[in-house]
Amino acid sequence: YVATDLDDTYTDADLKLQVDIKKYTEEVSIDYRLKVQLWDDRKELVTELNSDPFKIESIGKKRLDLSRLIKNPKKWTSETPYLYTLKMSLLTMDGAEHDAIETRMGFKETEIRGEAFYLNGVLLKVNAQNSHMQHPEMGHAMTEDIIRKDFEILKQFNFNAVRTSHYPPVNKYLELADEYGLFVIDEAGVEAHATEFVSKKPEFTEMYKER
């Protein structure tokens, strides 16, 4: 995962990454390295990080922790949801790309002081609405266009947050929420109010935690 930690003046930020690389076979391992690139919205490279060489000898995973100070990045807010592009590439030692993941992310810091919510050091009133992943014609198979239309309506009515009642949404929903400047109260997939006895059974504890 990726996290951002702004300094006391909410100017510069530490970009922090914790990356798990999993190996599923007993094949002989070779040396790899992880390359991380951060791009702005003009496709200009902001920074690049490279891990030390590593290998995974058997089935299992390797955890890598990387960080870099980013000077005065553009901040994400609900009114100006600026997003960077982060690409992580798993490379062999000759530079060949074995695998890659790309995502968009924003630099922001959220805090709760007393009973107040702050974004990047600024007091923010949270205006939230419940949202179900359902449509009168499409059912639960909501398309990207439908989700965008929902978010456009929410923004027109000055909402800056949405609660995914009562289950986690698809990843595209979360990606678009970042794009539109919406905080997401993402509910875990433990909906059981129709049969509440499930939540009282200890054997379901670990399943609940995993979700």
Residue ranges of model-derived segments:
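Secreted/periplasmic carbohydrate-active enzymes, especially glycoside hydrolases
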Residues: 1-184, 206-211
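Active-site-adjacent "subsite" loops/lids of carbohydrate-active enzymes
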Residues: 127, 189-210
